[in-house]
Design a protein with these regions (language model features):
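Short loop/turn segments that connect beta-strands within beta-propeller blades
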Residues: 37-41, 78-82, 130-134, 170-174, ...
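Beta-rich, blade/repeat-based domains predominating
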Residues: 7-21, 49-68, 91-114, 124-126, ...
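Residue-level marker for isolated small/hydroxyl-bearing positions within beta-strands
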Residues: 26, 67, 111, 159, ...
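Short, solvent-exposed loop/turn segments at conserved positions within beta-propeller repeat blades
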Residues: 28-29, 69-70, 117-125, 161-163, ...
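A short beta-strand motif characteristic of beta-propeller blades
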Residues: 2-7, 41-48, 83-90, 134-140, ...
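Blade-level signature of beta-propeller repeat domains, shared across WD40, Kelch, NHL, RCC1
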Residues: 235-282
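A short helix->beta-strand "capping" segment at the edge of beta-propeller domains
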Residues: 1-9, 38, 269-270, 277-282
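A short loop-to-beta-strand structural motif that recurs across blades of beta-propeller domains
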Residues: 32-34, 73-75, 125-128, 165-167, ...
Length: 282
């Protein structure tokens, strides 16, 4: 499938969000949050959080929430450009905070590394919920919880990168794990998004593809191949939410700050998957 390169010259783009006609994302290792105009290719710096930044989401009042990975916190970007604390998770977690999802009622769901993936064996950890100023941990046992997307009003799906699986979680009423869908070995699922037909589009970080997964049956197909690239996130965008934007970079993170190989690609699904659109709920 042919792709258009819409943005280039970043280090490690992730946390893609389509918001108010622009594509927002985090350049994780550069500690920068960008807003991108997909028409002109212009990137605008909206926030800088050293050394690492991850998940993005908006409150109903319009303020942007950002994950400060190393401080293990969610911070809020004010209209004056200043950052303030929204939720501090440092006393709860020993390792970096990761991606998150913000619901329409301002509830935040956020994961943590849970261990050092460069030196340690995988260790399960909790998924945090932040609601009305309160922090709790209703789900445990997730291995490197990463991308989070809402399926519907009752459920979210979470990528567990180093367990090679995605987990469907009930969020209404009693929060509980509903199912785990195991992906092929070494899939390393990272960011994900859900379409209007009940499928998750999952970025496979080190497997060079986007996997489309039926969340009811577990059936899956490699929908998009991106040879030679790390594939770190995807989201729907465009006026009709029928374009898939994909964050890619080099898989060797040791030189991405020097070489800036990060690119965001756009795939027109109207040509290959007619009728498939995003839900606008990432």
């Amino acid at each position: 499938m042919a792709a258009e390169v819409v943005f280039k010259g970043t280090a490690f783009p992730e946390s893609l969000r389509w918001h108010n006609g622009d594509l927002w994302f985090s350049d994780v290792l550069a500690g920068v949050v960008y807003r991108g105009d997909v028409t002109t290719g212009q990137l605008h710096i909206e926030a800088e959080i050293a050394p690492y930044v991850s998940g993005l989401g908006w409150l109903s009042s319009g303020e942007l929430l950002i994950v400060d990975c190393e401080k293990r916190a969610v911070v809020q970007l004010g209209s004056d450009g200043k950052l303030s604390m929204h939720a501090d998770l440092k006393s709860h977690w020993s390792f970096n905070a990761n991606d998150m999802h913000v619901d329409v009622d301002n509830t935040v769901w956020i994961g943590t590394y849970g261990y050092n993936p460069e030196s340690d064996s995988p260790v399960p950890a909790d998924l945090a919920r932040i609601s009305n100023g309160n922090i709790d941990f209703p789900i445990s046992g997730l291995v490197f919880a990463n991308g989070i997307a809402r399926i519907d009003a009752q459920k979210i799906v979470v990528a567990e990168t180093f367990a090679d699986r995605i987990s469907v979680i009930q969020t209404s009423g009693e929060v509980k794990l509903l199912k785990q869908i195991h992906l092929p070995n070494n899939s390393t699922p990272d960011g994900l998004v859900v379409d209007n037909q009940g499928f998750a589009w999952v970025a496979l970080a080190y497997a060079e593809a986007i996997l489309r997964v039926n969340l009811e049956t577990g059936e899956m197909v490699r929908a998009i191949e991106i040879p030679g690239r790390g594939v770190y996130d995807c989201t729907f965008g465009g006026p009709n939410l029928d374009k898939l934007y994909v964050a890619t970079s080099d898989t060797d993170e040791t030189h991405v700050m020097r070489d800036l190989p990060g690119e965001i690609l756009c795939f027109d699904l109207g040509l290959t998957h007619p009728g498939v659109r995003g839900l606008g709920n990432k």
